[in-house]
Amino acid sequence: MANIKSNEKRLRQNIKRNLNNKGQKTKLKTNVKNFHKEINLDNLGNVYSQADRLARKGIISTNRARRLKSRNVAVLNKTQVTAVEGK
C-alpha cells in the first residue's frame, strides 16, 4: 500500500476495529458457554442481548444471531421438558 496519510489512518482504524470486534465475538461465545453450563433464563437473556447488539452493529449477521437464539431456546425448552418429565 502506498504511504498515503489517509491509507495509514484507515489501516490503524481497521486494526482497532478488528480487535474490538474479535473481543465482542469472544464475549458472545463465553455467554453461550455459560448458558450451556448452567441453563437458565438469566444466561439466555445475556446471550439474547449480546447477539442482538452484535447483529445491530453488523459484527455478526442477523441470520446468525437468529440462529443462535433459536438453538439456545431449543436447548432451554428441551431441558425444561425433561425436568418436568422427571418429576
From Swiss-Prot:
Domain of life: Bacteria
Keyword set includes Transmembrane: no
Family: Belongs to the bacterial ribosomal protein bS20 family.
GO CC terms of this entry: ribonucleoprotein complex; ribosome
Disulphide bond pairs: none
Identification of the protein by name: Small ribosomal subunit protein bS20
UniProt function note: Binds directly to 16S ribosomal RNA.
MF terms in GO: rRNA binding; structural constituent of ribosome
SUPFAM superfamilies named in the record: Ribosomal protein S20
Entry's Gene Ontology BP terms: translation
UniProt entry keywords in alphabetical sequence: Ribonucleoprotein, Ribosomal protein, RNA-binding, rRNA-binding
A Pfam family of this chain: Ribosomal_S20p
